[in-house]
Amino acid sequence: DNTTNTPAQLVDLLLVNSCVSVSNIAISSNQSVAYFNKNGSTFPINEGIIIRNGLVLNTQGNYVNNSTLSSQINTNTDAYLQNISNNSGQSSTITDVAFLEFDFIPVSNSFSFDFLFASNEYGEYQCGFSDVFAFVLTNLNTGVSTNLAVIPGTNMPVTVKDIRNKLYNTNCESANSNFFSTYNPTNIPASTLNMRGHTVVMNAASVVTPNVPYKIRLVIGDYNDSGYDSAVFISGGSFTTSLDLGPDQTACSGNTIQLNTQLDSSYTFQWFQNGNPVGGNTPSYIVNAPGTYSVEVTKGSCFLTDTVTINDLAVTAPNNLQTCNTGAAN
């Protein structure tokens, strides 16, 4: 559906109750950025946002091997995508760029979301070249940007060249094929979208600094020409931020430990020790006894919680030692 939702509504669909403050929302075009749902199919994401370097409406329905595999909306370029493409050994221009972007302020130190990559380059063109996409997270205070659209456990960008199965093109070996899911031309009646192939659902994640402004830019482009589109599907409600009180700790008797949410006083706080309410409505709490501590944080519809265990460092009395000196006296 590329007509019903405004850019703000699309972002709301991604965030749901993820407790972030959002601003400066922008999309390239509602022809290339839109809402989707799996419509009763077996597609692995129930609903969310699709961003395609072409017409998103060409993606719906079963796989059809015709002109809908390729389309062009614009001739825009993108410097960040071009750099990724160049670093992969490609030399032609990235064009037909589509994006969704917005600024946000997290309330925790972690940020993540789920996504799936699909492309019509799978099969015939998976050995030679690939379209490029990125999830560019920028710290607006430092200007430092990071691409979160990488193969899990690596720093390799997600592309058809880097996630492929040689079953569908024997001219090149498989690469990270455990992340490849489905090649639709081999089973058209069971296909869930009109694209040749797609990956499994992956998770993009990053450490962030609470109360610091960031920009996230979800962007995709065509390599070299407008032929054989690619798309990224982002799961609705998967943009999450979580509260982290830190790891479980062990403390000596008589010592204190400060648990800190790193949030400001505009939130409401309720602390618990072993399930019982303790403390005041404060962002931090001083622990002076072992136990299981948790906090519930609310602000409007935002709700966050975390739990940490504080153990007592048990010190046992040492065993008595005896020695016998059998040497000659001096």
Report each predicted region and the residues it spans.
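Proline- and Ser/Thr-rich low-complexity, intrinsically disordered segments
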Residues: 238-330
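Aromatic (Trp/Tyr/Phe) and Gly/Pro-enriched flexible surface segments
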Residues: 1-244
